[in-house]
Amino acid sequence: MSLTIDDYKFSIALANAGLTVGQAAERAGMSRQRFYMIVNSKRATAQAVGRVAKALGVDVTEIIETN
């Protein structure tokens, strides 16, 4: 299963968490480069998106695209 992170929702969650991308990546336990790859990916794994959401302190449903 692949998911897409919504850019706007991600930006809001990042701002609400008061984190920089680097800080969020560190919380997710990955490099900034890998973190950016996941955030900008059109097809990220559910596990990867889950790590991003956890780093931001939100539920996955709060940052993914919905159609």
Where are these regions (language model features)?
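A short, Lys/Arg-rich alpha-helix, primarily the initiator
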Residues: 1-23
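Short, basic-rich loop-to-helix N-cap that marks the start of a DNA-contacting helix
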Residues: 41-54
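Short C-terminal boundary/hinge segments that cap the last helix of small helical domains
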Residues: 57-67
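Short coil turns linking two alpha-helices in DNA-binding domains
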Residues: 31-33, 45, 59
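Residues in the recognition helix of alpha-helical DNA-binding motifs
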Residues: 13, 27, 38, 66
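Key DNA-contacting residues within the recognition helix of helix-turn-helix
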Residues: 36-37, 50, 64
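Short alpha-helical DNA-recognition segment
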Residues: 18-37
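Alpha-helical residues within the helix-turn-helix
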Residues: 15, 26, 54
